[in-house]
Amino acid sequence: MSDAFKPLLAKLADGQTLDDSDAELFFAACLRGEPTPAQVAAAVTAIRLRGETVGEIAACARAMRRAAIPLEHPYDVIDVCGTGGDGLHTLNISTAVGFVAAGGGLKVAKHGNRAITSKSGTADVLTALGVNIDATREQQRKALDEAGICFLFAQAHHGAMKHVSPIRQQLGFRTIFNLLGPLTNPAGAKRQVVGVSAPRFVEPIAKALGALGAERAWSVHGSGMDELTTTGETEVAEWRDGVVRLFKITPEAVGLPRAALADLTGGDPAFNAAALTRLFDGETGPYRDIVLLNAAAAFLVADKVETLVEGVALAAEAIDSGRAKAALAGLVAATNTEVPA
């Protein structure tokens, strides 16, 4: 079986790109464990050295989506997450944004994992907050119905990644697989705000989201962060109506003060959970400001507001009214309550 992949590997070794069908077939085979570890490593290394194309990113994501365990639901959900890998060890921003978005009336399917390069990933901080990250699909659906937000633990929904995980660990550098988390939401989110770890990925990820069927999506990188940032300028690529629009955002443009990166530095899951709790209890400052900015983007992408300034106001209301805190409490309750299958 592994001999069948040699022509494809030869193309990659020569610096050629894979067409969409070949890329999807190969990555689907990787998720079934058919190529040898050496072949998988050779392929992803060659793609990394040449640079991932939009077609390859979308094809790999499409194969991963098809191998995933989905969450069925009737909603127009949004996801707010990043690729990770920015190495800045900030507080959990997109996690907090998920609850603010739910508090503002959106249905949020938050896709995430444990920390890989950071000290506290989404799954880690949610566990510290009392969320059962190993919730059943029935519990996830209950949370989405009642709290407006569910958490989709990547390891539980993407079991096929077990075939490539050891290879990724042994390589120890970023490959195309590191870009796929935000592109493979098991709830089929058509609206997304995706943070990327480097400026060069901003436009390709937006185009890949479009190729995968997104209705409206932002791909963002903020001065070194895989988030919209209040520390400087954020680069944005928006996918909407079949085209990508590139622009930049500053915090001042939406009425928020600029922050220092040191003001956003996080710690272990307990530290970050405590900061998130204080945020929802009314603490103001740089953490609140960056959460407001990112939540505003979510409201805009979901067509809940018409401008980022309106989105900031709605995000502030979601926190100050207690609705964001209630969304967190609802997720904790739903994931720790037995629900019949």
UniProtKB/Swiss-Prot annotation:
It catalyses: N-(5-phospho-beta-D-ribosyl)anthranilate + diphosphate = 5-phospho-alpha-D-ribose 1-diphosphate + anthranilate. Mg(2+) 2 binds at residues 226-227. InterPro entries: Anthranilate_Pribosyl_Tfrase, Glycosyl_Trfase_fam3, Glycosyl_Trfase_fam3_N_dom, Glycosyl_Trfase_fam3_N_dom_sf, Nuc_phospho_transferase. Its cofactor is Mg(2+). Belongs to the anthranilate phosphoribosyltransferase family. One of its GO terms (cellular component) is cytosol. Mg(2+) 1 binds at residues 94, 227. Keywords: Amino-acid biosynthesis, Aromatic amino acid biosynthesis, Glycosyltransferase, Magnesium, Metal-binding, Transferase, Tryptophan biosynthesis. Pathway: Amino-acid biosynthesis; L-tryptophan biosynthesis; L-tryptophan from chorismate: step 2/5. This is Anthranilate phosphoribosyltransferase. Catalyzes the transfer of the phosphoribosyl group of 5-phosphorylribose-1-pyrophosphate (PRPP) to anthranilate to yield N-(5'-phosphoribosyl)-anthranilate (PRA). It comes from Caulobacter vibrioides (strain NA1000 / CB15N). Anthranilate 1 binds at residues 82, 113. SUPFAM superfamilies: Nucleoside phosphorylase/phosphoribosyltransferase catalytic domain, Nucleoside phosphorylase/phosphoribosyltransferase N-terminal domain. It is an enzyme of class 2 (transferase). 5-phospho-alpha-D-ribose 1-diphosphate binds at residues 82, 85-86, 90, 92-95, 110-118, 122. The lineage of its organism: Bacteria, Pseudomonadati, Pseudomonadota, Alphaproteobacteria, Caulobacterales. One of its GO terms (biological process) is L-tryptophan biosynthetic process. Anthranilate 2 binds at residue 168. Binds 2 magnesium ions per monomer. NCBIfam families: trpD. Its EC number is 2.4.2.18. It comes from the Bacteria. Homodimer. GO terms for molecular function: anthranilate phosphoribosyltransferase activity; magnesium ion binding.
